[in-house]
Amino acid sequence: MEAAEGSENYDGIQVLLSREVIDTAPQCPHGPTLLFVKVSQGKEQGRRFYACSACRDRKDCHFFQWEDEKVSQARLAAREEYNKSHQPPMTHAEYARSFQEFTALPLAKRKFCCDCQQLLLQTNWETHSRHRVLGDISLSQLKRPSQLLHPLENKKANAQYLFADRSCTFLLDTIIALGFRRVLCVGTPRLHELIKLRACKGTTPPIKSLLLDIDFRYSQFYSEEEFSHYNMFNHHFFGGEAAKLVCQKFLQEEDGNGALLVTDPPFGGLVEPLAFSFKRLREMWKDSNPENANNLPIFWMFPYFFESRILQCFPDFAMLDYQVDYDNHALYKHGKTGRKQSPVRIFTDLPLDKIVLPASEGYRFCSVCERFVCSENKHCDICNRCTSKDGRSWKHCSQCKKCVKPSWSHCSACNHCALPGHPCGTAGDGCFLCGGKGHKRRGCPHLSVSADGERMKRNLKQRSIKGNMKKQPTATTSKKKKRKRNNPC
């Protein structure tokens, strides 16, 4: 068994990744599950278990199975039936035929159900008569499905934050300037839309794009050559081998030349499974020319504080200063300053000096670092580089021998820089509660002696309060219990 390539041993839950594990893993509605294990002091603790690759909360996907658990044939059959029942109601080919019928309708008969997020043919009107329905859907609206569809906003599953037009335009202009002519859009529907819109207008060199996304709703708007239902956390094509071949053919056109992978994963997702999937996509690209020493170039959008994790998986990557903005995120928007700026950056293996950041948005070229940086990112002569990560001017600490955030100061007790007023001695690899080594807070003996007694008292008190309320069970709660019993996972 191999751990994620480049992953470090750390306390907590760790994912174990290999091609063999994913190919033989049990499946949930989101494809092959991932194998996890609890790790303490770099060593496995307890039994390994399978859980959903896409959802971090068991409320969103109930799947759980011990690695060594014996599963009956009846349970396997029930699980397979359950997985099938949670797939899209139509195949991609059926959606494509429906879309052709829809576009042939006159404007007055083109309707979209806002509640079901579905394009409606006349045969569906009666079924959706009590729903919120949008009429007169124009052809231009059909070319911008990300503006028609409600973004998925579950932060622990498939949260969709869509590029603002400013960032999307910058990305496409940069892609064109770098000479790429085919873009594999993994979780970037806005970029896919813009590429297709510009291709229709003929205002830019011809660029092709293929969208891979876990949101099957895009099947309503794009053909099988334009979109594949895909889970980037386990490299699973829901359309099977046919969809995988479409992607492989797209990557291998012109012997793989001129192709670029652009991805914008959910920020709460594990870095290691994502990197594993991107490496699998690189392998698909390389099959066209196995002797090619190069790799499929990547633009990976992710918060800057994941830099170390990404560099563990891709040591040849570097982070751009460009701040990626989103339309439907309260904080990640252009124009904010200081710590409220968007923390999302672009990680890439392309030469940084070739990527020009717009001066109109406050970026400048550092001749020493040979790359474009944020205007507030001052060059440190001691570190010999522009050191800021968050858009503010950082300061050099001679004792730490590195630049730190402007709000930090050196703590002689901790022997490193931190926020003023921080609790000394709680940082590090030991226990947060007592500061001891060899265990974490959950396994602290002091917690079991003192805190557990108080917690038990609180629980008993809460139970007595609930008992006194004499609340009658509602229909909704009984339904929830029934659903839980019927779940085969």
From Swiss-Prot:
Residues 381-431 form the DHHC domain. Residues 455-489 are annotated as: Disordered. A zinc finger (GRF-type) spans 28-70. PROSITE patterns: DHHC, N6_MTASE, ZF_CCHC, ZF_GRF. Residues 478-489 have a biased composition (Basic residues). Zn(2+) 6 binds at residues 411, 414, 422, 424. GO terms for molecular function: nucleic acid binding; rRNA (adenine-N6-)-methyltransferase activity; S-adenosyl-L-methionine binding; zinc ion binding. Keywords: Cytoplasm, Metal-binding, Methyltransferase, Nucleus, S-adenosyl-L-methionine, Transferase, Zinc, Zinc-finger. Zn(2+) 3 binds at residues 366, 369, 379, 386. S-adenosyl-L-methionine binds at residues 160-163, 190, 213, 231-232, 264. Pfam families: N6-adenineMlase, Zn_ribbon_GRF. Its EC number is 2.1.1.-. Zn(2+) 1 binds at residues 28, 30, 52, 61. It catalyses: adenosine(4220) in 28S rRNA + S-adenosyl-L-methionine = N(6)-methyladenosine(4220) in 28S rRNA + S-adenosyl-L-homocysteine + H(+). A zinc finger (CCHC-type) spans 429-446. GO terms for biological process: positive regulation of translation; rRNA methylation. One of its GO terms (cellular component) is cytoplasm. PANTHER family: RRNA N6-ADENOSINE-METHYLTRANSFERASE ZCCHC4 (PTHR13493:SF3), ZINC FINGER CCHC DOMAIN-CONTAINING (PTHR13493). Belongs to the ZCCHC4 family. This is rRNA N(6)-adenosine-methyltransferase ZCCHC4. The lineage of its organism: Eukaryota, Metazoa, Chordata, Craniata, Vertebrata.
